[in-house]
């Protein structure tokens, strides 16, 4: 089952989250159509921006759109002109106030969607598919990925019959639910037809569900002190000022001096025996 299913949907609530977060009763159909139209609008004409994913969150009178991109300067434009244009088109499409957030992808070499888009662009530029796949795998592994698999399907190198080829490096455990696997898909448009590019990137294992990890992080942030131990208040008293500890004099009598101790030692010592004449 793990080999065929979409890894993002297979791990919802464990290592991934929904890309659209809202609730609707009677307007469910129209909201789904709006989400598809929003993503299609953002992908059209934004191929050079390197958009990894688009997250949509709705309230009663507002729509929040988060764009994760590798090149935020292209999406923002000069003095924010491009961002204003996108916001205006989204408000016209949805009929509500739109809050547009543009977020930068810190490490695009280990983002599956961006890797798939990069391979597809090379295939469109008549680069050998094996060379493009191996170069992408080497770059991802050097950037910190623990495993990667890239698959290309279509008329590879202009062959008469379409076929599927893939390359893999490292571990890609698709059946393991706690494995953090990123998945991306992109289509390359060539003179021989379209070639589909799929990418799986294994980033390591996660402990517990997504909600449990957030609760643990909040608990760690709320505990004072270092290392989860509460800090001790006040100063530690010195050795000579420890409260009302009784001294030897209070317990009865003064402490024996060195002279008295020496006299007692002499009295206790046995006298040497005298030699007796036979």
Curated annotation (Swiss-Prot):
One GO cellular component, as annotated: cytosolic small ribosomal subunit
InterPro entries, per database record: KH_dom, KH_dom-like_a/b, KH_dom_type_2, KH_sf_prok-type, Ribosomal_S3_C_sf, Ribosomal_uS3_bac-typ, Ribosomal_uS3_C, Ribosomal_uS3_CS
Picking any one GO molecular function of the record gives: mRNA binding
Bias kind Low complexity: ranges: 214-223, 259-278
Residues covered by region (Disordered): 213-278
Query: In what ranges is there compositional bias, type Basic and acidic residues?
Result: 232-253
User: Which intervals hold domain KH type-2?
Assistant: 38-106
What biological processes does GO assign it? translation
Top-rank lineage group of the source organism: Bacteria
List UniProt keywords, sorted A-Z. Ribonucleoprotein, Ribosomal protein, RNA-binding, rRNA-binding
Family to which the UniProt record says this protein belongs:
Belongs to the universal ribosomal protein uS3 family.
Q: List, alphabetically, the NCBIfam families matched.
A: rpsC_bact
Q: What does this protein do?
A: Binds the lower part of the 30S subunit head. Binds mRNA in the 70S ribosome, positioning it for translation.
Quaternary structure, from the entry: Part of the 30S ribosomal subunit. Forms a tight complex with proteins S10 and S14.
In Swiss-Prot or TrEMBL terms, this protein is called: Small ribosomal subunit protein uS3
Source organism (scientific name): Nocardioides sp. (strain ATCC BAA-499 / JS614)
